[in-house]
Amino acid sequence: MSLYNNDKKFRVAVCFSGQARHWQASAGNIKRFFNNDEYPHPELGIPVQTDYFIHTWDTNTWRYPKTGHDHSHNERHNDGAAIKEVYKPVTIEVENWIPEKFPRSWDSMFYSLAKSLLMKRNHELKNQFQYDIVVKARLDTIYNPAHRFPLFRIWPGIAYTSTAISKFPTEFNYNNFDDVLFYAQSPVMDLLGDLYSTYKYLHNADLVAVNDGSIDLQPDMY
């Protein structure tokens, strides 16, 4: 039986966020990677159900690989209906992109993550259950076709990633995983989604640099 549910299903929520970009080229690969529904859970032996939640933008930002982030251009698209048809998500929002609303480097990333996780949480509350695993993913990613998303047991209070892990050189070399993919139990992902509220507070206190998104905290704030 699932840890949080009484319907004898292991429930996975895949929360897509960020720009769609080359979503058409990656959709088949992504659905195969996450679709474990035809197999029982490897440890629990119960059916697996995977639901999608999508927050994305009506605009894609493009730049050449070796150019800086300040040398890019925006293109609007009308792919929302097609994305919905392919993924058949529980909830989808294609939001109007307003650059002035997100002046700093990570603003839109944290915002979109928070919105996708809020969709997931609203669905849980409405239907009185909780997902066993919640995944933060992107619409423009290609995964190794030899693998599928791992359904091993995960622990409370821990977030996992299968992508590159870097270090924060100015934060005691703590681990930092990127925005491609990470996952955790549902309450942990809700906490991570709330990073946007904290980041927004720091913005309003003029503690986040506009150009590079770095945070400048005074000693008395620790």
Regions found by a protein language model. Name each.
Residues V134, D140:
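Short aromatic/hydrophobic "clamp" motif used to bind/position activated sugar donors
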Residues M1-G28:
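N-proximal low-complexity "stem/linker" segments adjacent to membrane-targeting elements
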Residues Q19-W23, N60-T61, T141-N144, V188:
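Short acidic, S/G/P-rich loop/turn micro-motifs used as interaction or catalytic elements
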Residues G28-Q49:
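Short, acidic, metal-binding catalytic loop of nucleotide-sugar glycosyltransferases
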Residues A27-G28, N144-I154:
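Short alpha-helix within the catalytic core of nucleotide-sugar-dependent glycosyltransferases
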Residues F102-F129, T141-A146, T161-Y222:
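Catalytic core and acceptor-binding pocket of nucleotide-sugar-dependent glycosyltransferases
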Residues L44-N60:
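A short beta-strand-loop structural module common to alpha/beta enzyme folds
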Residues H55-N127:
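Active-site-proximal specificity loops/subdomain of glycosyltransferases
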